[in-house]
Amino acid sequence: MATLNYEITTSGGVRAVDPETGAEVATCPATGTMVVQLLRPASGVIVREAYYHYPRARSNVYYLDSQLKEVWRAERPSASDAYVSAGWLGNGVLRCATWECWTCDIDSASGRILRKVFTK
């Protein structure tokens, strides 16, 4: 099978689509609010959900494998924080900013914080 395409659904979740056939391979609903950003590592997809009203018990940035099964959730600098932006820094590292003014470099293989800087 070719590398899958990932899209945000009209209901705010994620779907995986076979680019050759257009067939939907898998779907995953949002886990707290709605999906607002998708980032593509070598396989699978990294998802960021809207932070506003996201349940603070868990991270709003997470990695789904090619079948849209959750593999990890990004570590947060504090238990109450949420990610407001995410982008590729390079070499498998995400750079994410949080609501509580942290900039975090996150390992895309594990979701662990590699470095964090207070930026307020």
Regions found by a protein language model. Give the residues of each.
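Aromatic (tryptophan-biased) beta-strands that constitute blades/sheets of beta-rich domains
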Residues: 12-32, 63, 67-78, 114-118
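Repeated scaffold domains used in trafficking and secretory/extracellular systems
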Residues: 2-4, 29-43, 48, 76-89, ...
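A short loop-to-beta-strand structural motif that recurs across blades of beta-propeller domains
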Residues: 59-62, 102
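Short, compact, well-ordered microdomains
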Residues: 77-120
